């Protein structure tokens, strides 16, 4: 009986991850820079202030997920840029693993790999396509990518920064998906 309950819990958790990914994905796809965004409550207003990038501002949020979706999409794009889409793919993958009852052998290593992958994706977005952004002024990699590129270009120049970020991304993917190159 306990195994059946545990299996049901895993499947429901998988469905919840996939539903959350669909919500975030729909919010990102229907992101509109003209959506009116409220100011966050203190103390969150010290780390995030929504920027109205266009005039005139819409009367109501046009995001498919409403005001919550508009705020979520803006927050993710400002901090992670295109890394937010990586977050959606990750949530779908985690949900699928839960639905199939596939357990991960080393969740800490996978988390470290995901963080490396996210850092590499945000940094590469800021380095390679800096002005190709759906909305935030900071650029395609968000604040995370802009910070990485500023530090890496100062110490490694353009080519070195690209090599470091690419290596970070590839190593992170290998750690996250729990695979190795040498495995037959």
PLM feature spans:
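Alpha-helical transmembrane segments used as membrane anchors
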Residues: 1-184
